[in-house]
Regions:
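Conserved catalytic cores of very large enzyme subunits
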Residues: 2-750
């Protein structure tokens, strides 16, 4: 059993005999039932640094969204020496480390695709060194080139028609959360020793493809751990041994995360479930009188500041999919342990308090793991932060814990993953709304007129018959599921081969569980369209080529989002039907297939390629995001809408079910206290029904309109809203996306 002087005062045995951070947490954390009265205001150091960072953010916005871009150096763990927010203020930085050599400067990361890396520079007026182009086209193959070398013509057609899109074939797949806590608890040397043991135990027998690959991967992981030590040493820190106090624990953990964001540009780069872990160190130092509450808050403020600075170079088409420059630096708070003890600590309050000390911000993506059994004080404080900032999201801990245990992280927007035990193969989403139109038109794309899907016989009747449409839809969605999975298998294979996440995987168990994450877009429109066909009369309108391009609806029909089982049960069918088709396919590396109802802001892009729908949605307009009902469909208030979404079984969409709702403050009450109490009641009632997720926005439409027209107002500089699975500064959205947000239902009554 290991013993380190840095562990003095810590309880437990198992975590000393094996890498087991969960056991360490369970044996040492102290649940907190009190209120927020203990919290401290920002220190002078925090105010100085945050003030400087805000100045840099204003410069960044004035320059079109990018402050600086690397054009000479390929990013890597040791590609840069130390960097600081401001050299003249570095004595105030309690947590150090930048992705590059300057704050908010975006790294050059060509391993996902050299073309993407070059375009992301050129889009903002930067010219990368031509030698880099030569290296990554002639001498070093990239993930993107590998994928496109292997794509079939059918895959290319589906990709360009946007029936499948957002694929991670030009950028890092992300959604892999290293257990960055391990760096603080064990130190790098011990982690390297354990990886060396894993290597020695791998391949004592037949050298199969899988064994050979695993030995290479473990070696890369071991090497990455060594590089982490060098990177930390450049800042004057020795992370070879465990952290001895709270300051080191925060710093060591951040160095682990910094290693990930220096080497990968994944769409989602979560930092994981770190709050309770860090609270153990902070509480020990508080008890020993070597740390004050002001200093504890300062550490969390500065870690949060670093999370707010995470930036990646992106191309225009990427920004259309994931608007507002998100990084999904997701931090999970709260939750209930499997032993029944809640896991709320003072540190969960401290992380939420950063939104008061430094104002609202989209990053980090603060996520409350919610249960009605959480302490009332904490629920009220989280609700207060929602009312004040609209910056946090809620996920149902009671729904996730049976599947993922009590030490899971949120690896992107809403998807859970067991920390340090598993990884996820991210796979964007398939457009089921467009799939329904393909079913009606026999695989012909309604926008291009090209044959993209299989040449199944389309529907020839003037009025749509429900049973016939279902039969056609079943065949077309089966084709789509097969093509989708094959495309993702190819992408994940090439990503492992050319853009392997060694730094992140070094902090995950070698015997890793893998999930295969698919996704669904256009969910509510498929429901409402099938409902219209079933309960009303839908007439087809064809162009001169005989393609159905529009529909006339005669009569009324139930819409998803009104707590009407007739529509809601169609939604359950749509989800289960597609998941079943995904599950019957072979998935790469024996990964476990899951799916999600989650679109991010790609609902706007998807909509541009999706024609008129039988539910009345107009062609080329945004699809409704995630699992949220169609715009304007909700006629019975917030609770009815929540009840509809709550009927979707989480076990059939383990990758996540995103629900975004906007509530006018007056719908919750006339004063802050009443609004907070009412929001807690809404959250308790909603999550007790078993749904997965809720984004909560508390503001009126007029504020959105004013922010769109007057983005220069100081009050809107950090105006943050929740969209599908993440938060974003409203003024960072394109006008088209701002209009999309404004068009969504804003509930004036509960």
């Amino acid at each position: 059993m290991l013993e380190n002087e840095q562990w003095e005062g810590f309880e437990g045995r198992i975590w000393k005999e094996e890498i087991n951070v969960r056991d360490f947490i369970q044996k040492n954390y102290k649940p907190y039932d009190g209120d927020e009265s203990f919290l401290a205001d920002p220190t002078d150091a925090t105010n100085k640094l945050w003030g400087r960072l805000q100045e840099l953010q204003k410069e960044e916005r004035a320059k079109g969204g990018v402050l600086d871009m690397e054009t000479e150096v390929v990013s890597g763990l040791t590609a840069y020496g130390p960097g600081y927010i401001d050299e003249s203020l570095k004595e105030f930085e309690r947590v150090v480390g930048l992705q590059t050599d300057k704050p908010l400067k975006r790294a050059f990361m060509p391993y996902g695709g050299i073309k993407m890396a070059e375009q992301s520079c050129e889009n903002y007026g930067y010219t990368p060194n031509p030698e880099l182009h030569k290296i990554f086209t002639e001498y070093h193959k990239t993930h993107n080139q590998g994928v496109f070398d292997a794509y079939t013509p059918e895959m290319r057609k589906a990709r360009s028609s946007h029936i499948i899109t957002g694929l991670p074939d030009t950028y890092g797949r992300g959604r892999i959360v290293g257990d960055y806590r391990r760096v603080a608890l064990y130190g790098i040397d011990y982690l390297m020793e354990e990886k060396a043991k894993d290597l020695n135990n791998c391949g004592d027998g037949t050298m199969t493809d899988e064994v050979i690959r695993l030995r290479e991967e473990i070696t890369e992981q071991h090497r990455a751990l060594g590089e982490m030590k060098k990177m930390a040493a450049s800042y004057g820190y020795d992370i070879s041994k465990p952290a001895k106090n709270a300051k080191e624990a925060v710093q060591w953990l951040y160095f682990g995360y910094l290693s990930a964001i220096k080497t990968q540009n994944g769409a989602a780069m979560s930092i994981g479930r770190v709050s309770t872990f860090l609270d153990i160190y902070i509480q020990r130092d508080l008890d020993n009188g070597v740390l004050t509450e002001e200093e504890a808050q300062e550490l969390i403020d500065h870690l949060t500041m670093k999370c707010r600075m995470v930036k990646f170079a992106r191309i225009t088409s990427y920004n259309e999919l994931f608007s507002g420059d998100p990084s999904w630096v997701t931090i999970a708070l709260g939750g209930i342990g499997v032993d029944g003890r809640h896991m709320v600590t003072k540190n969960d309050y401290r992380f939420l308090h950063t939104l008061e000390n430094m104002g609202p911000s989209p990053e980090p993506n603060l996520t409350v793991l919610y249960s009605s059994a959480l302490p009332e004080n904490f629920k009220k404080y989280a609700a207060k932060i929602s009312v004040d900032t609209s910056s946090i999201q809620y996920e149902n801990d009671d729904a996730m814990k049976p599947e993922w245990g009590d030490d899971y992280s949120i690896c992107c927007c809403v998807s859970a993953t067991q920390t340090g035990k598993e990884m996820q193969f991210f796979g964007a989403r398939a457009n089921l709304a467009k799939c329904l139109l393909y079913a009606i038109n026999g695989g012909i794309d309604e926008k291009s007129g090209k044959q993209v899907g299989p040449e199944y016989k389309g529907i020839t009747s003037e009025y749509l018959d429900y049973d016939e449409v279902i039969e056609k839809y079943e065949r077309m969605s089966d084709w789509l599921a097969g093509l989708y999975v094959n495309t993702l298998n190819l992408i994940q294979y090439m990503h492992d081969k050319y853009y392997y996440e060694a730094a992140e995987m070094a902090l995950i168990d070698t015997d890793v569980r893998r999930t295969f994450a698919t996704g669904i877009a256009g969910f509510s429109h498929v429901i409402d369209s099938l409902s219209a066909i079933k309960y009303a009369k839908v007439k087809t309108i064809r162009n001169e080529a005989g393609i159905v391009t529009d529909y006339e609806i005669e009569g009324d029909f139930p819409r998803y989002g009104n707590d009407d089982d007739r529509a809601d049960e169609i939604g359950i069918y749509v989800l289960k039907s597609f998941l079943d088709k995904i599950k019957k396919r072979h998935t790469y590396r024996n990964s476990e297939p899951t799916t999600s109802l989650l679109t991010i802001t790609s609902n706007v892009v998807y909509g541009k390629y999706t024609g008129n729908m039988p539910d009345g949605r107009e062609a080329w307009t945004p699809l409704s995001p995630g699992a949220s009902p169609s715009y304007g469909a909700e006629q019975n208030g917030l609770l009815a809408s929540l009840n509809s979404v709550a009927k979707i079984p989480y076990e059939w969409a383990l990758d996540g079910i995103s629900n975004t709702q906007t509530i006018n403050p007056t719908a919750l009450g006339n004063d802050k206290e009443e609004q907070v109490d009412k929001l807690v009641q809404v959250l308790d009632g909603y999550f007790d029904q078993g749904p997965h997720h809720l984004n909560v926005n508390i503001f009126g439409v007029e504020k959105l309109k004013d922010a769109m027209e007057h983005p220069e107002k100081e009050e809107y500089a950090n105006f943050t809203i929740r969209v599908s699975g993440y938060a974003v500064k409203f003024i960072d959205l394109t006008r088209e996306q701002q209009l999309d947000v404004i068009s969504r239902t804003c509930h004036a009554e509960i």
